Amino acid sequence: MTDPKVPRQRRIIDRRKLAAAVEALAEQQGEKARPAVLKVLREALEKGRDELSQRLLDRPSAGHQITAGHAFLVDQLVRVIFDHVTTHLYPVANRSSSERIAVLAVGGYGRAEMAPQSDVDIAFLHPSRRTPWCEQVTEAMLYFLWDLGFKVGQSSRTPEDMVRMAREDLTIRTALLEARFVWGDRELYDEARKRFWSEVVNGTERQFVAEKLAERDARHERMGGTRYVVEPNVKEGKGGLRDLQTLYWIGKYIHRARGAAELVDAGLLTETEYHGFRRAEGFLLAVRCHLHEITGRPEDRLTFDFQKQIAERMRFAERREKSAVERFMQYYFLQVKRVGSLTGVFLAQMDQQFARKRARTGLLAGFNAKSRMLKGYTVFGGKIAAPGDNWFRDDPVRLIEIFQLAEANGLEIDPRSMRQADRDSVLIKDQVRNDPRANAIFLDLLCGRNDPETALRWMNEAGVFGKFVPDFGRVNAQMQFNMYHHYTVDEHTIRAIGFLSKIEKGELAKEHPRSTREIHKVKSRRVAFVAALLHDIAKGRGGDHSILGAEVAEELCPRFGLDEDETDLVAWLVLQHLLMSSTAQKRDLTDPKTIEDFVAEVQSLERLRHLAILTSVDIRAVGPGTWNSWKGQLLGELYDAAHERLRLGHMKHHRSERVAAKKEAVREALGGKAALLEKHGRLLPDSYWIAEPENVISRNIVQYDVAREISEDLSIHCEFDEERGATLVTVIAADHPGLFYRIAGGIHLAGGNIIDARIHTTRNGWAIDNYLVQDPVGQPFAEERQLARIEQAIADAIANRGELVPKLAKRPLKQTRAGAFDVRPRVLFDNDASGRFTVIEVNARDRAALLNRLGRALFENQVIVQSAHITAYGERAADTFYVTDLTGAKITDESRMDTIRQALLDAASDARQAELEPA
């Protein structure tokens, strides 16, 4: 935005030397010189780019210098090409007044902010009418630029066209706002520039600002609505380069600022804020340049696979607690946070300047709208403001108070007060942190009844949150380098608090009926909000964040004003905040031992209520799509079973009673087909009746009866299960070894992901296997053609029509970026988690063929799978199998477990994937 001096320019490109070489070729070869001229130009371009690439490696954060260097390189080439075209290709001895051209740089090129693969945006300006000469010169120049490999955005206009189109189109107006003269007729450019300011800009300032801000808001919404998405768009994302450019455009439009430095003279930024502006801009420009260098294309998305490479290129080193890529991304998010803060300050100053102008000149000149006072603060226009510049310095506790009052009264924070809070946040020392009044105010804010999420986000933006709670400051802008978490830790935490507030107000009753009901039964709502705040507080410290976080909770809770019982409960919740989701998603909830072990840890209804609520908001806050009806179903089943055990001290019904009750429910569900229960019910073992819900059992019995009536050896049925948010796939076949892994392979080949599997064998030797299946983005299959494809793929797999494993290996990963992560497979055996089965948990890189391979490895080692529970955490899968040996007994022999473990590790390894993939 400022035009930095490009050092050692001739090492990038020596225009005079290049022009002389082109001139000599033109003199020697005449009309046939074009190939030779193009070769010389291309060599100059490649040499210049090589020089700038090396400079970027030598000074990896010099974003301004590198982008200005690329613009300088293009400038010189354009000038040489223009001179060559007008001197040798289309010379005119006595040009008329119409035979004039000015070449202008617009867009990023006009700002002298060009990344290595940026488009070259050029405007050709000519007088009132286009002559053949103007058209010939324009066309010849464009062909040279295209042949050099540039992607050119071009326009050809008269000053009259420019004025008319700029009035009508915001994009054109913005492009011309930053147009820069490159070569040609300077007088023509000056004339057009003068007309632009007098005929386009004057009187449209407020309209331009409003349209630019609306454009920005729409862009933010497209890009994810937050600056803390862990794969940000460096250019278009919130807090990115486009936001900085928007500030510059507005400042230039209103104040005719020629560079970002002049925003200080206009009173829109302080010197300190301007330096923050430049630092953030330079860093983001550098990141964009590295992206272009790595990819060889105009890439602006900072995806996981590029983050590691750029962290290395920009010389971020690993530290004991954080990897290099996490340190790089934390610095990135701190810069975009600074951009957000600058945006607020800038727009507040702009708004104030407009307001002063209206007051001086408008119909209401001399009229002062009424403000009111609230505990010493000024409230005006729905905003709360500090009444003076020393307000926070006189009493730093007010730095917390202003946010609490805003939350309690439904007010916004005046941006000028945000600026003061940002400046004065350094006043928060131990004396303020340990002040009982400050902590009571903070707790009131955290547990606010209106919108604590927004107020806490403002507090975080101003730097006050991290200063008052230093442990929270440690996770500020900290990313989690995985594909599961969508946001930085601080943003995830604030979102979790927001979801908790919504649940308490009943706004999420449909998705979270139990949490909505139970939150009003807890003894201390403060515990719920403090636990949400602290559940991830110790991430990034190099150890188990649950254990370390519980220790932090034991220190912080008394400071916040919680009593001993509340402190103990918060510490336990932080320690066990993953217990409920892990149990629900990785364990068989129909196994009594699962409930027994869970209840032994939870111990009380109060703990259960709080844990269920915390689990729900934690999953919701991970990111869009992480909460679904299937997870809700699992958590609900676990909650209900644990609640019954805790309330009664035991399960309400013993095994035989539960089976009898289930049969009665199935009889009712079958209705007119109840006779089928008598016909086939005795063939189904007790384990089947306990494991399956009555609606699934009734479907299974009808399907089994039809298959037997028509003597069908294989029956496959798929249907959408709305309650579980998945597709129920039932396979009934003569039981034989290897059936499970073949069915799994068929489902995956049809594009499905298995999220749960229950494998049963009737007393007469038929397999009844139920699978819950979703598509790669967590949605059920519901269309007839999709269901038919799954059924056909399973039939083909069971019939062994074609080699299954190579086909699966060729299927692309649903998320190819998974290769950016180091996921080492791990296999755990647990003979205590179930009374009847050995539980095997496999953690590995998620891929389409994984479950099929694991199932085959178990089959080849004579292991019988009774149920499987599949959970995906971004790039990582956790597959849990309840198994026995061929006799139906647990697997307890150490050497046998070692053999099975190695087979599973081999099946899940990247090396095995590489063997199967085509060369």
UniProtKB/Swiss-Prot annotation:
Residues 374-727 are annotated as: Uridylyl-removing. It catalyses: [protein-PII]-L-tyrosine + UTP = [protein-PII]-uridylyl-L-tyrosine + diphosphate; [protein-PII]-uridylyl-L-tyrosine + H2O = [protein-PII]-L-tyrosine + UMP + H(+). Residues 1-373 are annotated as: Uridylyltransferase. Signal peptide: none annotated. It comes from the Bacteria. Keywords: Hydrolase, Magnesium, Multifunctional enzyme, Nucleotidyltransferase, Repeat, Transferase. Uridylyltransferase (UTase) activity is inhibited by glutamine, while glutamine activates uridylyl-removing (UR) activity. Residues 489-611 form the HD domain. InterPro entries: ACT-like_dom_sf, ACT_dom, GlnD_Uridyltrans_N, HD/PDEase_dom, HD_domain, NT_sf, PII_UdlTrfase/GS_AdlTrfase, UTase/UR. One of its GO terms (biological process) is regulation of nitrogen utilization. Modifies, by uridylylation and deuridylylation, the PII regulatory proteins (GlnB and homologs), in response to the nitrogen status of the cell that GlnD senses through the glutamine level. Under low glutamine levels, catalyzes the conversion of the PII proteins and UTP to PII-UMP and PPi, while under higher glutamine levels, GlnD hydrolyzes PII-UMP to PII and UMP (deuridylylation). Thus, controls uridylylation state and activity of the PII proteins, and plays an important role in the regulation of nitrogen assimilation and metabolism. HAMAP family: PII_uridylyl_transf. Has four distinct domains: an N-terminal nucleotidyltransferase (NT) domain responsible for UTase activity, a central HD domain that encodes UR activity, and two C-terminal ACT domains that seem to have a role in glutamine sensing. This is Bifunctional uridylyltransferase/uridylyl-removing enzyme. It comes from Erythrobacter litoralis (strain HTCC2594). The lineage of its organism: Bacteria, Pseudomonadati, Pseudomonadota, Alphaproteobacteria, Sphingomonadales. The gene is glnD.
